[in-house]
Amino acid sequence: HETDPDGQVMSSMIETLMFLQKEYANLRYAFMTVNNARSFGSGSERLYVSNKEIKTFEPLKEICEEAGGHIPSPQLENQNKAFASVLERHNKAAYLVVGDSANFTNWAAGQPNEADGTCVKADTHGSWHSASCDENLLVVCEFYFIL
């Protein structure tokens, strides 16, 4: 005897499978797009992305971490160039973090100057400047890719 005479269970399963196949294709496309942008853009394992918001330094860490990223911290010249290209595209400066043991820095002439502030911002050319942590700057987050 049949337990699904009208084929409703089978139809529902087919519909669900088709939906999942479409979702998989969309996710695969999104992943490949990001992966290709990463390898095309800078040859670096880091991707710099802005949500176009303007914020002070304080909320930046939480915003980036909620998105799965970090406050930008370029460690190499090509990473700083990739970061600067985002700033140039938006024509805005953004915060970054400079580690204590940084091998790479890109301070502008006369910088760092703590009289200007204890935070660090990069201008649209990728040059670093001391800045007030209360400045409203472009939100940019850094994402790591290890593929």
Swiss-Prot record:
InterPro entries: C-type_lectin-like, C-type_lectin-like/link_sf, C-type_lectin_CS, CTDL_fold. This is Phospholipase A2 inhibitor subunit A. GO terms for cellular component: extracellular region. Expressed by the liver. Disulfide bonds join C64-C141, C119-C133. Coiled coil: none annotated. Its main location: secreted. Residues 62-143 form the C-type lectin domain. It is found in: Secreted. Glycans are attached at N103. Homo- or heterotrimer; homotrimer of PLI-A chains, two PLI-A and one PLI-B chains, one PLI-A and two PLI-B chains, and homotrimer of PLI-B chains (with a ratio of 1:3:3:1). The keyword Secreted applies.
